[in-house]
Amino acid sequence: MKYELQHTDGAARAGLITTDHGQIHTPIFMPVGTLGSVKGVHLHEIKDDINAEIILGNTYHLYLRPGLEILEKAGGLHKFNGFDRPMLTDSGGFQVFSLSGIRKLSEEGCEFRSHIDGSKHFFSPEGVMDIERTIGADIMMAFDECPPGTADYAYARKSLDLTHGWMKRCWKRFNETEPKYGYSQALFPIVQGCVYKDLRQESAKFMSDFGAEGYAIGGLAVGEPAGVRYERIAGVYGLVPAALGR
């Protein structure tokens, strides 16, 4: 994956991400295809009418349904859904947040119950990397915890330590494994830290040290005031590599 910064205007940036499945002009609107396809529209509308250059799939949901065996047999998510342009998968971290009543977190990972049938499952950082390799998106997200915007400092501190520990394990597993379908994949670390400036800055510096091909700023729009959200985004811009997609 390659990123080219083309224009700037203050803090605003326009750039071009190049993947093996095509190019993404940033900033970009990314339609959400939770289960691999975008609901309510045909694929040709996504490609021809909306001209979506990338869509998002969800690791948690794709793992449960249709499942990894079907996805691998199809040759990955691109072949499964017929979308031959870039794709991104989130790691399931937001679902860890949203399913708080049916999950249990530890340093090892996250134990949760399926929202479909109540069956028990376990996500570890290594396991999520393997799942995302099987799904086959061009851009993979690291496994993280997304704390609520109302979390107190003690919880946010503990959550960030968990996310940082998981990131080390994600990075190791990612570099120990290869893409399954003949094209490259990139892993993006995710900056967390809730609404706390010092934690956000600590996380931005920590994640930047991995030398990844791009970065995500996560844990936003989860209950915090809009003004705080924008402050926290602005507060990490200078700490995340400017020459990369983010």
List where the protein language model places each region.
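Glycine-rich phosphate/ribose-binding loops and adjacent secondary-structure elements
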Residues: 177, 185-246
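Non-catalytic, usually N-terminal nucleic-acid engagement modules in DNA/RNA processing proteins
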Residues: 1-180
